[in-house]
Amino acid sequence: MPRNIFIVGPQCAGKTTLIQALEQLFPLPGVADEPVMVINEVVRDVMSANGFSSHDIGSDKWDQLQALTLEAQCHAEEALNGRWFVSDRSGIDPIIYAQLGRQSKQKLLDTKHWKASRQRMQDGLVIMCEAGNLSWLSSDAVRLNYTDSVEWEALNKHFIKLLEQEHIRFVVLQKDVVCMKERLDFVVAKLIAYERL
């Protein structure tokens, strides 16, 4: 079974579109003999079930949202134990976004949910999709609304710093790689390379 794949990074970096294409690509002879299971972005379900919105940033509700999202992500991964999956986001995403509210990231880093998710990420292939392609920037009730790209692109550094701090090996899918075939080729090449480690 190939390594599980975690597609992480700031919003509007092409993660969900990439995952949809990966789902169609597999099985792929010589790489993966079985279809891949998909963990869809859990935060949308958590927000819908609990009445959260992106307007809750900076409030206690924002902090609660990040904790519930981390827990839901961990449960989604555990539900596919023994199955090959690709995950739209990961346990690290709510930790990054917790920094935008009152809650410190340390509180989430100390949870059992993060420790379990981190181990799966350390054993998997982590693709960090880089933000910065302005044509992809959008907002809705879930996504934060950025007035310019500077703050949005700064999230790249937060993801990289935390991945390194948590000893999670990752590769960056650069923002200028916009062709879907090139994005898919990048992921497949990294998956093959990681299987040889």
Language-model regions: role of each:
Residues 7:
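Hydrophobic anchor at the beta1->P-loop junction of P-loop NTPases
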Residues 11:
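The conserved Walker
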Residues 15:
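Conserved lysine of the Walker
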Residues 18-19:
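Post-Walker A alpha-helix
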Residues 24-72:
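Conserved substrate/cofactor phosphate-moiety recognition/catalytic segment
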Residues 51-100, 105:
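Conserved nucleotide-sensing/catalytic segment adjacent to the nucleotide-binding pocket
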Residues 102-179:
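A glycine- and Lys/Arg-enriched "phosphate-lid" helix/loop adjacent to the NTP-binding pocket
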Residues 164, 168-172, 181-197:
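C-terminal accessory "lid"/substrate-recognition subdomains
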